[in-house]
Regions:
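A short glycine-rich, His/Asp/Glu-containing loop-to-beta-strand
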Residues: 15-54, 58, 109
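Short acidic-glycine-tyrosine-enriched beta hairpin
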Residues: 75-93
């Protein structure tokens, strides 16, 4: 009996994000936005960092999926690598920096009131207030 010819496996990458924004430090892509939670992918380019910031109405859980970085939470700085997880409580002062030579990629889950206006920038390399 003749065996069916197997087709080579092909995969097409599709953009599944519902919102996205390019920033001076990289890019964020939003994949879920439901009442009480939101899920994003954050891409931090080499040599860049997010503003030192805090949120009044949401906490965040980050999972590092690629690259490495320096994570600041309040007065503590920690090196993070793929597989590491960090929790940012409501009002926790935080930032992430990519000192490496490849993109730092984070999956971020926000819990609470997930509004882009809920950001207080305490320091910003790009002059944003």
């Amino acid at each position: 009996m003749k065996q069916p010819q197997q087709q080579p496996e092909t995969r097409t990458r599709m953009s599944n994000w519902i919102d996205a924004d390019d920033r001076p430090w990289g890019r964020w892509e939003e994949y879920l936005n439901e009442p009480g939670y939101r899920v994003k992918r954050i891409i931090v380019h080499p040599g860049q960092r997010l503003s030192l910031q805090r949120h009044q109405q949401r906490s965040e859980h980050w999972v590092i999926v690629a690259g490495s970085g320096l994570f600041t939470l309040d007065d503590s700085v920690t090196e993070v690598n793929p597989g590491d997880k960090v929790f940012i409580p409501v009002r926790g002062v935080h930032r992430i920096e990519n000192p490496g030579d490849e993109n730092l990629i984070i999956i971020e889950t926000q819990l609470g009131v997930c509004d882009e206006d809920d950001i207080e920038r305490l320091e910003d390399d790009y002059g944003r207030g």
